[in-house]
């Protein structure tokens, strides 16, 4: 997607604080964090929202989310964290590229 900020981050056109990356996903620190350690898991393939993502990819993404959540918890010595995923403007989605907030 030409206008997608997350696609531009994934393609290296916009710098990011990457904390993990593999062939399928990129995990970055949020530029405007809601809290310390606020990270985003971005699929490298563009999906506008959860309604477009296939179950296999979603399964791998949530497996990664568990790993990232444990890393954030241990690194920052926190007791709890939220996982948030918005779909559609009415739900608060501001970037039309599926992503998971931790």
Feature locations, PLM:
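HIT superfamily nucleotide-processing domains
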Residues: 1-102
């Amino acid at each position: 997607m030409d206008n997608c900020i997350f696609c531009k981050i994934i393609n290296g056109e916009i710098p990011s604080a990457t904390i993990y990356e593999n062939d399928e996903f990129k995990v970055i620190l949020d530029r405007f964090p809601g809290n310390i350690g606020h990270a985003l898991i971005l699929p490298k393939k563009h999906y506008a929202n959860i309604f477009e993502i296939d179950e296999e990819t979603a399964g791998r993404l949530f497996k990664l989310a568990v790993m990232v959540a444990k890393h954030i918890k241990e690194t920052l010595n926190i007791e709890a964290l939220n996982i948030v995923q918005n779909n559609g403007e009415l739900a608060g989605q501001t970037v039309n590229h599926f992503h998971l907030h931790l």
